Amino acid sequence: ALNWRDGVLKKVWTYDSGATAGKGAYGKGNHSLMTADVDGDGAMELIPGSSTINSDGTFRCATSNTHGDALHVGVLVKGKGISVFMPHESEGGHDAHSADTCAFNFNTSGGSDNGRGVAEWVSASNTTSASCSSNAGSVNCADGKGSAPSAGSNFLIYWDADESRELTGGTSITKSGGGTLLNASGTASCNGTKSTPNLTADILGDWREELILHTTDNTALRIYTTTDVTKRRIYTLMHDPTYRMQVSFEQSSYNQPPHVGFHIGAGMADPPKPDIHVK
């Protein structure tokens, strides 16, 4: 961890999973790193995969699982705080667990490398739990049971008028269960078979997200924005610390779609107002 003060970077702490004090997180990292305030104290914890590191650089908790590729961190079950969803390369299967305690919501194993997966509130039928979707199936994030609407295995975007999130893959936007909302002709996606966008983020500030893709001749970036009018009012997502940090992670490692630190979905409560003051 580094502090930026008066134009100077200063190291605050280093977490070493190879050292005795950090061994609880050894072998449990992903090809990505996310942050979230998992205990509500105003400071961000680190979630590098199957473990959680405290904001002061000490070990917090870990699951019994090890390495995975995809990583999703956000509110996946109503009333349960921040959860983590991971498909697993080492164990196969997938799991969802508490980012605070690392207790499992559900955990499955077996099969081959399960490298791709997505967790999100993608349908009006997601009333109390988001969908956790991967090659191991699409289930409720709360307990791993039932048959949940598919959240796909690629990227996500808030696009139309309702609170459920849409799916992105390649250069298109679709609704879970069918229906194409956008085909961005003349553009291309990134990262080979992963087919991810250059960026998805709420860069214009009305809480729906923009889709940013490069043209097929690599000469320009195109920004696509929704034209749908919505009655739902949410402050700009970039004022949510969890979301803002996860947008930055899209540009590194195995990029994943950003999640907010509160619930957006069917039946949602009005979100909290950000405590932001500009001098």
What does each of the following model-derived ranges do?
Residues 1-279:
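Beta-propeller-forming repeat regions
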